[in-house]
Structure formats: structure tokens, C-alpha cells
Amino acid sequence: MSKLKDKIDDSLNDRLNREKAIELARIQIEKDFGKGSLIKMGESPVGKGIESISSGSILLDEAIGVGGYPRGRIIEIFGPESSGKTTLTLQAISEVQKNGGIAAFIDAEHALDPVYAKALGVNIDELWLSQPDTGEQALEIAEYLIRSGGVDLIVVDSVAALTPQAEIDGEMGDCQIGLQARLMSKALRKITGILSKSKTCIMFINQLRMKIGVMFGNPETTTGGNALKFYSSLRLEVRKIEQVTGSSADDVVGNKVRVKVVKNKVAPPFRKIELVIYFGKGISREASILDASIKYKLIQKIGSWYSIGDDKLGQGRESAIIYLIKEKELTNELEIKLRKIIFEGLSPDSIEIGPPNVKKDKE
């Protein structure tokens, strides 16, 4: 018994000695590098959860896992042409502005449509815009904005359009291998550390290219080298899966797109969701709420009919979406309840909800 006690005492003394040694090291580190250079994770902002920016779709917020795009992180959104990449970023800018935040758009492609941005809810009078001439200029502007600490969201459109100065100065036929990859690698090394301190979210839109000579596996790859893949905390792949038609088959009013979380450092990856994007309107909030409400049994689907309890919303998906567009009070109530279920762990069984004009008080 005494031997066991001696072992415990020795272990405690060893623990105390190691803690004293770490404390002395911490004092020296703070003396050399400044206060807060070494702290316990529980005392730092890192250990207090991840702040996020809503994507504008409750389905995408759930797929990402933290209620939206994580702040202080690098995000890459990539996919084929006309798949909805820019729409996702403009919708995020709209959400930032709704909550009183500040957003910036670095338009390296020189192709931002202010009319479309305004239609998606972006306040173009308050949106900071830069149309740089070179890739170096674009990334330095992004760095300045991050260091300012005043910007909540920066969108870079796109990585493929970040042309290095040497490429612009050279001849059209010059072979300059790896210039853009080296540019991206250096820029990302510089901004990663300051991003977490400023809580700025930076989103890079990227394009797909085909690898030459690939016989097996996926021949697609993104531009700008591998650095962005490594530094990104979140990578979203966006692909168009079908067209959304109106009153006739020839009346195309939008696209249905699939968003896959290819990489996620803040929640489990590889989740897939489908979004409806209407031309000139953006992501259909009501369609996302309808799908999420069916998933969590706030809305019932029997055959082609959609209902809440005994009260019918409409026959067919489009009719139910139109009903939710008209009944904004109900739609807002559904979204609030869904966020409590998804992000706060509230049981769907504890919720009673119904259309405003027919809702019955629970006895």
C-alpha cells in the first residue's frame, strides 16, 4: 500500500514539475513573441465554437454543419460553367448585408452583373468592388482587406482569372509553367494566419479543367495548383443536374443543382444536397425549407399532396412552394423551428406548427 502511495506522490510531483516548466516556457514565449502567443485552447476563441455566415439555404447550412460558411476560414466553390457558383457567393453577400455586415467582391473576371446581384438581394451601393488588372494585385487587395479587420466576407471571382504579372508582360506563346500555382501558394501562406484573427471569411470561386492523358479516374481538376485545396477549410462542388421548367417544357425558369461538400474541416464531409436556383432570383429559400420540413416531418407528403396536419398546402411540389412564397409568416416560422431542430437539438415531436389562417391553439 505504501509503495502505491509513493508512486502516486511521485507522479503528482512529476506533473507539478512539468506544469512549472511549461509556465516558465510560456513566460519566455510571451516575452519574445507577445502576450497570448501560447494559451490553453479552452481560453482561446478557437475553443468557443465556430461563427458562421448563413448561405441563404437551410439545407446548405445543415450540410456545411455549423450553420453556414465558417468565419476566419478559406472556402473554395468550384464546378462546371453555369452551375451556380457565383450565385452561391452573391447569396452569401446578401445574408452578410442583411445582418449589418460588410462584404467585398474582387472581380478578376470583370464580369459581375450588378442587376443580377441586386435581384439576389445584394445592396450594390454598400458592396465594395475591386476589378484588379493582375493576380498579384487582386491577392494583395484581399490581404489589405483582411488585415483591416472590417470586412466580414470577401469573394474572389475567380482563381482562373488571377493572371500573374509575368504572364501579362510576356508574349502570347511564352511557356510559363507553375506561375499561378506559386502565386496562390505564397498568397495563401500569408493570409491564413490573419484570417482567423480578423474573423473574415474569404471565398474563392474556381473553374474546372481536364487533365490530358488520364485514362482511369476523374480527369477533372481545378486551376491554380494544389495550395488552395490544402488551405481551404471548406470545398464545395456545384453541378447542374436538371432544368426547372415553368408552365411548359420549353419555359426554363431555373436549374436544380447538386452541392457536394468535398472537404470540411469544421464538420463531417461528403454531404450532398440539392438546391433550386431560379434565373434572376437566386436560391429558392422556400424550396429548401419545404425539403427540410419534409425531412424533419414538419410537413407531410402523402402522394402528390403536401400538408401540415390536416391542412393542405397544395398538390404537387410547385404548388406547395408557391403557397410558402405567399405565406411568408408560415415560411419564417418553419425556418426558425428547423434551425432549432438542426442546430439546437430540439425534438420535432415537441413542435406544433400550421398555416397562419388555420392554425389551432394547443389546449
Swiss-Prot record:
Q: Which InterPro entries match?
A: AAA+_ATPase, DNA_recomb/repair_RecA, DNA_recomb/repair_RecA_CS, P-loop_NTPase, RecA-like_C, RecA-like_N, RecA_ATP-bd, RecA_C_sf
| Entry's localization field | Cytoplasm
Could you tell me one molecular function GO term of this UniProt entry?
A: ATP binding
The protein's UniProt keywords, in alphabetical order, are: ATP-binding, Cytoplasm, DNA damage, DNA recombination, DNA repair, DNA-binding, Nucleotide-binding, SOS response
Name the source's superkingdom.
Bacteria
**Example of a GO biological process term:** SOS response
Mind telling me which GO cellular component terms the entry cites? Answer: cytosol
Q: Enumerate the PANTHER family for this protein.
A: MITOCHONDRIAL DNA REPAIR PROTEIN RECA HOMOLOG-RELATED (PTHR45900:SF1), RECA (PTHR45900)
Functional summary from the UniProt entry: Can catalyze the hydrolysis of ATP in the presence of single-stranded DNA, the ATP-dependent uptake of single-stranded DNA by duplex DNA, and the ATP-dependent hybridization of homologous single-stranded DNAs. It interacts with LexA causing its activation and leading to its autocatalytic cleavage.
Q: Which family does it belong to?
A: Belongs to the RecA family.
Could you identify this protein by its name? Protein RecA
Species per Swiss-Prot/TrEMBL record: Borrelia turicatae (strain 91E135)
